[in-house]
Amino acid sequence: MSKTAALTDIEKSKATISFWKFIAMFIQALFLIGLVEDLCYYHMFYSRQYFFLEILVTIHTGFSFIVFLIEHKPLIMLHVGYMTLLTIIPIAYMVMQGVEFGILIFDDYHILVFRDFHKFGCSIMFSLYYIGYIVVCFLFIEALEKKPVLPQVYSIKPKLVAAVNPSNNCNVYPML
């Protein structure tokens, strides 16, 4: 098998890391764009507390983007750990929207409109988006775990080169 046809373990590891890193950073970039858009256009409708929380989430997302960019493994693991703990929030919101939607379905006096479907559908989509992001982050961490620490050596015997001054072809370190 030729050297160009077969990828080495290092190249496979780098390709896997690059793929999961790209997916995770793409999701973060989409979320960051949404947060900035939300801050720019809808800030006048928010209370001060919610606006402050929105700014903190935006700063956190930007910081996480940089952490993934430089591949700082301990901070990535910390980020994924508390994001996993916070998974309860979108799932609880989805359940609340599902209960509200279920009540509206069986209500005889309420006509279902697009807004009712939209709220429940958006809660499902955000929950799937959030869980998908966590799965991608775990796969990225797993790929970082398999990253080799030292480069592979392809030759059996290393070639030793004597220290020679090329101008007059004499040894640079004659005492050694």
From Swiss-Prot:
InterPro entries cross-referenced by the UniProt entry: DUF5373
Superkingdom in the source lineage: Eukaryota
Protein name: Uncharacterized protein C48B4.6
Species in which this protein is naturally found: Caenorhabditis elegans
